[in-house]
Amino acid sequence: MKVLLIKDVKSLGKAGEIKEVADGYGKNFLIGKGLALHATTDVLNKHKAEQKKLALKEEQEIAQAKELAEKLNATKLTIKHKVGANGHLIGSVTNKEVSDALEQQFSIMIDKKNIALDNKIKTIGIYEVDCKLGHSIHAKLKIDVIAE
C-alpha cells in the first residue's frame, strides 16, 4: 500500500514523502497513529496543491527579504546617545536600540535578535551592522552614532 507521510517516521522517511509499505504496517501503525494518510489520488492532489502554496509563499518571503535588504543597504540610521567627558559613550549601543531606532525613523521592524553587533559600540562614529532577514539573506546597515 502507498502512504503519504504526514510526520517524519524514523527509518521510513520524512513528512511529505510517498512510501510503499505493508498493508498492516500502513493501516494499523502509520495511519492509526496519524503519521500517514492512504495515498489516494485525492490526497496526492491536495498535497501537491499545498506544496505549490508553500513554494509560492516562500518565493514571496524571499522577494520581500531581498527588497528589505536593498532598503537597509541604502539606509543610514542615526542614533543619539549620551557622551561622557572623554568622548566615549555612557554605556553602549545595543541591538534593542538599533531595532527601536529603525522602527521609529523608518517604520522597519527587525527583531533585535537578527541584528548582529560584532563589537559593542562605545564611541561616536559610523558603523556597519549585519542584519539577518531570513532565507540566508543579509543586509548591511550603516549606523551613525552622534552625541545627544
From Swiss-Prot:
InterPro entries named in the record: Ribosomal_bL9, Ribosomal_bL9/RNase_H1_N, Ribosomal_bL9_bac/chp, Ribosomal_bL9_C, Ribosomal_bL9_C_sf, Ribosomal_bL9_N, Ribosomal_bL9_N_sf
Pfam families: Ribosomal_L9_C (PF03948), Ribosomal_L9_N (PF01281)
MF terms (GO), sorted A to Z: rRNA binding; structural constituent of ribosome
One GO term (biological process): translation
Keyword set, alphabetical order: Ribonucleoprotein, Ribosomal protein, RNA-binding, rRNA-binding
GO CC, alphabetical: ribonucleoprotein complex; ribosome
Family as reported in the entry's similarity comment: Belongs to the bacterial ribosomal protein bL9 family.
Protein role: Binds to the 23S rRNA.
Protein name: Large ribosomal subunit protein bL9
